[in-house]
Amino acid sequence: MIGYVTLGVSDLAKAKAFYNELLAEMGGKTLLEMERITFFGQSMAKPMLAVCIPFNKEAPHPGNGNMVSFTQTSKEAAEALYHKAIALGATCDGAPGQRIEKMFYGAYVKDPDGNKLCFCHFG
């Protein structure tokens, strides 16, 4: 059910060093690195932890860099959950779409309390 959890950080290099060392104890390793985010885990098919500089580059705090992602079996399933969340009172924080070509499709909402959620499909 959980795809990945994102934690906002202020120093990505320091966070990568810390989590690489810590998560190695559980068989974790760096799986994907991009300019402002790094994903750790055992494989892309299992739950992951990501650390990132918040998208708006403001200071990280709960709700600004933190997000829970729910992996789905298809792009259509991710989009359906996005629309269900909107119908239940969530607000759009990123319309459904391919974010990384042939690798990641995501749809983002904020729940009624402002918590950021993602419904995604890897592929």
Task: Describe the residue ranges of each PLM region.
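Short amphipathic alpha-helices in soluble, non-transmembrane regions
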Residues: N20-L22, L81-I86
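N-terminal beta-strand motif that seeds the catalytic metal site of vicinal oxygen chelate
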Residues: M1-K16, V68, G123
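Long, continuous compositionally biased terminal/linker segments
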Residues: G41-Y82
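Short beta-strand micro-motifs in enzyme catalytic cores
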Residues: T38, N66, M103-A107
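Short glycine-enriched loop/turn motifs at secondary-structure junctions
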Residues: M1, H61-G65, E101
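Vicinal oxygen chelate
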Residues: H83-G123
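Core segments of cupin and vicinal oxygen chelate
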Residues: L7-L49
